[in-house]
Amino acid sequence: MLKLEKITYLYDHLPMCFDLRIQPGERVAILGPSGAGKSTLLSLIAGFLAPTGGHMLLNNQDHTASTPAQRPVSMLFQENNLFAHLTVEQNIGLGLHPGLKLSGEQRLLLQHIAQQVGLESCLDRLPAQLSGGQRQRAALARCLVRSQPILLLDEPFSALDPALRNEMLQLVDQVCINRQLTLLMVSHNLDDAARIAQRTLLIVEGRIDYDGPTQALVDGSAAKASVLGIKSAVIS
């Protein structure tokens, strides 16, 4: 269970407040205008930002004031943050130990995750020798080796072309099923949201303005679809 109770934060004079419940294994997309608070919400959950009020439960434990390292969360950003001088294997290994002192069991886990994301033949390469999609796979693998139950994605595939983006979404979909992960994914693309999540949050001015079926936004049956530039089918 991921539960936010009146989590507040002040961002550039915009007061934000989030109330949210997400069940284990649920996948939720987060959409909304630029600057509305989508990435801020993920950063609050990950512990990169400290709320000014409220309570937060992650995996049924109070993590309102815990550090990022203490939280049962992994987060993948738009920038893959791979170290150019390290091999793919070493970059992934950083998710297990910052000094890359891995046990035999950890090395086996790394190999297994690399195989899951299709990088088993690229482990000795440097990031510059990879395609954009492969670099994001490596960054995703670094998240997955941490074996945390909650995965946060902050527009990690927005810079990829449509074919690669769809490929990565399919990979995330399969990984979430296999590992029973709880997923929150920020996106500007409603089609991407529909591919990965049945439930969508629409963030507007620091609040959750819509919390419901993704399909209702796609087909315009939700009145709030107009926020995304979709003509609402609802007659007022």
From Swiss-Prot:
InterPro entries: AAA+_ATPase, ABC_SmlMolc_Importer, ABC_transporter-like_ATP-bd, ABC_transporter-like_CS, P-loop_NTPase, Thiamine_ABC_ThiQ. It is found in: Cell inner membrane. One of its GO terms (cellular component) is plasma membrane. Keywords: ATP-binding, Cell inner membrane, Cell membrane, Membrane, Nucleotide-binding, Translocase, Transport. GO terms for molecular function: ABC-type thiamine transporter activity; ATP binding; ATP hydrolysis activity. Its EC number is 7.6.2.15. ATP binds at residues 32-39. It is an enzyme of class 7 (translocase). It catalyses: thiamine(out) + ATP + H2O = thiamine(in) + ADP + phosphate + H(+). Residues 2-230 form the ABC transporter domain. Its main location: membrane. It is a peripheral membrane protein. SMART domains: AAA. It comes from the Bacteria. Pfam families: ABC_tran (PF00005). NCBIfam families: PRK10771.1, thiQ. Belongs to the ABC transporter superfamily. Thiamine importer (TC 3.A.1.19.1) family. The complex is composed of two ATP-binding proteins (ThiQ), two transmembrane proteins (ThiP) and a solute-binding protein (ThiB). Part of the ABC transporter complex ThiBPQ involved in thiamine import. Responsible for energy coupling to the transport system. This is Thiamine import ATP-binding protein ThiQ. It comes from Yersinia pestis. The gene is thiQ.
